[in-house]
Design a protein with these regions (language model features):
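Helix-start/capping segments and mature chain N-termini
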Residues: 1-76, 93-165
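Hydrophobic/aromatic-rich structural module bridging two neighboring secondary-structure elements via a short loop
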Residues: 84-96
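Short secondary-structure junctions
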Residues: 78-86, 142
């Protein structure tokens, strides 16, 4: 599937580095942000962090300095001298903050959407219960196709793309 340029995990309490865990399947929340340019800029960064912190509170993952800690880890792991066009994923559970960086795949013009009958657990949150979605995505060329989750004859969302109507 994706080739990661960075994969690191940190203890949530102390921010000490620990063995990498992607946290998929855990009780937790993630966000994926587009990072681009030199110096690096993150599209809609404030919105991503605000939604992440709100969702973490709803999941009972509470730390007063969480926003500051996430920013510290992002700055620690990004180079000021590198030109970016990547996706930065930040995932958290009650014990671990996991960050990863992968190249952003540019979609082809002839893009297909494979419909899959599936409704995510608690779809109002970007939770880490994505195992079924990832199993579908791992068998596809993500530059040419994505999955559309359908339930009750309605398209709910996609695996990785944005839907615009």
């Amino acid at each position: 599937m994706a080739t990661y340029l960075l994969k690191k995990s940190y203890q949530l309490k102390s921010l000490k580095e620990t063995a990498f865990k992607d946290l998929w399947g855990d009780h937790g929340i993630f966000t994926t942000m587009w990072i681009f340019g030199k110096p690096a800029k993150i599209l809609f960064f404030d919105n991503h962090i605000k939604n992440l912190v709100k969702s973490l509170k709803d999941y009972g993952i509470i730390k007063r300095s969480i926003k500051k800690d996430i920013l510290k880890l992002i700055n620690k792991n990004l180079s000021k001298n590198k030109k970016y066009n990547h996706l930065l994923r930040v995932a958290l559970n009650k014990k671990i903050v996991s960050i990863s960086l992968r190249k952003r795949i540019r979609p082809k013009l002839n893009f297909n959407l494979k419909l899959v009958k599936l409704k995510r657990e608690k779809p109002q949150y970007k939770n880490l219960k994505y195992k079924k979605i990832l199993s579908h995505l791992s068998r596809m060329d993500n530059s040419k196709a994505d999955i559309g989750l359908i339930y009750d004859k309605k398209i709910l969302e996609t695996g990785t793309s944005n839907l615009l109507f």
